[in-house]
Amino acid sequence: MSWAQAILLARGASRGWGGICSTALTGAPFSQVPPQAPRGLRCSAAAHNPDSSLVPHPPEPPRRPVKALAVHEELFRPALDGARNKANFVRAVQNFTEYNVHKRGHVDFIYLALRKMREYGVERDLSVYNLLLDIFPKEVFRPRNIFHSIFLHYPRQQECGIAVLEQMENHGVMPNKETEFLLLQIFGRKSYPMLKLVRMKLWFTRFKNINPFPVPRDLPQDPVDLASLALRHMEPDLSARVTTYQMPLLKDSPNAMDPTETHIVGIQSPEQQSALARHDPARPIFVEGPFSLWLRDKCVYYHILRADLLPPEEREVEEIPEEWNLYYPMQLDLAYGRSSWDDYEFNIDEVEEGPVFAICVAGAHDQATLAKWIQGLQETNPALARIPVVFRLSGSSGELLPSSSELEEPPPPPPEGQEEEEDSQQRQQQGQS
């Protein structure tokens, strides 16, 4: 070892011991002095790592979910009239933009407004969504170079813009030119919200008329009109006739004999009437339900009048003339290229069910209400008066409704002494006989 290396080692050792001695002279205990290795000596990295201390660190406090500011919640408080409509919602958004010029906390406010839209009934209004997008500052979140476009530039703001577009997609709201212009001003063309908009414009136009049985956007509020729409939606026969057997009566109506009287609306086609007239009176028919039918966000419950399937030996097979048979036309087609292993038939599992004679939508699902429907059907179907009708009713939640015999409470059991006396009397009578 040269003399220069020896001098450097001695100087480093003196500095390390000098630091320890100086802290000891100030009154600190020796156990609390941090270990300081000489600068010239080699030591492991664990000696300098603060995590290797034997003293446990306090646990980090759990992160709480981010909540909207109380100031934003006050903007959506109901007005003096208490009405939650589009005017009050737009007023709350305008108050935020007027009193918050720098638009601090605009992301939290937009998330809060998206949650409040269903309460105010504006979740399907395109102008309200454009009003929320207009809250974003313009020309601030646009990418300035290629790296901003590759990586998620201003991720929280872009995720908020995507959330607005996703809620529009969930409610079937088609963006327009104003929506596209706002996104170009806010995030630019090469951004994720703009990519979401392009995808929505592509698929919305293709799936707009994909449903062969479309449902109107605004459903009627009247239960009778809603029931008629549901029945027309279920019945494929255009010649079927919708009949209102009973109109609902208001509870405050003075002329109402029964204030709980509900609506009864039914539908039946001429083919169903002829099938019911040919039905065997010895076989009962059944009233089953309620079954659910969803029309957008409204659920309608309906009942059916049906019969069991006839056994195979009693079915009447309708003979079709050979020249009318479309399945086996009068021509000979010999396919010589086919072999015995070629099978062009599809395996279709068809479940045969009994005939359905009528469908009904009623406000109540009890037997008394449905009996009025059967009485109304007897006016146009006289054969129904001779056919026994059995009610198979179940609850709306899938639970079976108890019958009238199950609702009656069983008689209380007799006392024990009385049972023994009755048994002894029966034995004496049997012995005398």
UniProtKB/Swiss-Prot annotation:
Residues 1-48 form a transit peptide. Ubiquitinated on Lys-372; leading to translocation in the nucleus together with RELA and NFKB1 and expression of NF-kappa-B-dependent genes. Pfam families: ECSIT_C (PF14784), ECSIT_N (PF06239). It is found in: Cytoplasm; Nucleus; Mitochondrion. GO terms for biological process: cell surface receptor protein serine/threonine kinase signaling pathway; innate immune response; regulation of oxidoreductase activity; regulation of protein complex stability; toll-like receptor 4 signaling pathway. Its main location: cytoplasm. One of its GO terms (molecular function) is molecular adaptor activity. SMART domains: ECSIT_Cterm. GO terms for cellular component: cytoplasm; cytosol; mitochondrion; nucleoplasm; nucleus. There is a cross-link at K372 (Glycyl lysine isopeptide (Lys-Gly) (interchain with G-Cter in ubiquitin)). Keywords: Cytoplasm, Immunity, Innate immunity, Isopeptide bond, Mitochondrion, Nucleus, Transit peptide, Ubl conjugation. Interacts with MAP3K1, SMAD4 and TRAF6. Interacts with SMAD1 only after BMP4-treatment. Part of the mitochondrial complex I assembly/MCIA complex that comprises at least the core subunits TMEM126B, NDUFAF1, ECSIT and ACAD9 and complement subunits such as COA1 and TMEM186. Interacts with NDUFAF1. Interacts with ACAD9. Interacts with TRIM59. Interacts with TMEM70 and TMEM242. Interacts (when ubiquitinated) with NF-kappa-B subunits RELA and NFKB1. Interacts with RIGI, IFIT1 and MAVS; these interactions promote RLR-mediated type I IFN induction. Adapter protein that plays a role in different signaling pathways including TLRs and IL-1 pathways or innate antiviral induction signaling. Plays a role in the activation of NF-kappa-B by forming a signal complex with TRAF6 and TAK1/MAP3K7 to activate TAK1/MAP3K7 leading to activation of IKKs. Once ubiquitinated, interacts with the dissociated RELA and NFKB1 proteins and translocates to the nucleus where it induces NF-kappa-B-dependent gene expression. As part of the MCIA complex, involved in the assembly of the mitochondrial complex I. This is Evolutionarily conserved signaling intermediate in Toll pathway, mitochondrial. The lineage of its organism: Eukaryota, Metazoa, Chordata, Craniata, Vertebrata. The gene is ECSIT.
